[in-house]
Amino acid sequence: MTGTGEAQQMIADILRKIVAVYAPQKVILFGSYAYGKPNEDSDIDLLIIKDTDKRPIERWMEVKRLLRDRNRTVSVSPLVYTRQELEQRLAIQDYFIQEVLEKGEVLYG
């Protein structure tokens, strides 16, 4: 686990890279870093919303490659959905997605 200031800087750096290179519509931080309860096993959980024709695994790999940093002590766990996929998840009352959208911290968009 990193200190609060260090964690905030790391998240800001990650966000800058995602916005500059991946150009998402929205980025939401969720999980322990968003809810103020990170521990030594916590990762940075991000929901990234981007309209694209790429398959889910291709999107995930693209973001993971973009964020690869051997010096970072905290891993990043991105979820990449299109707006249509999010709407579908909400239509079936996906509790996880509902919670992320309600409790997560919008970092961009």
What do the PLM-derived regions correspond to, one by one?
Residues M1-K26, Y35-E40, K50-G109:
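Catalytic core of pol beta-like nucleotidyltransferases
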Residues S32:
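Conserved H-loop
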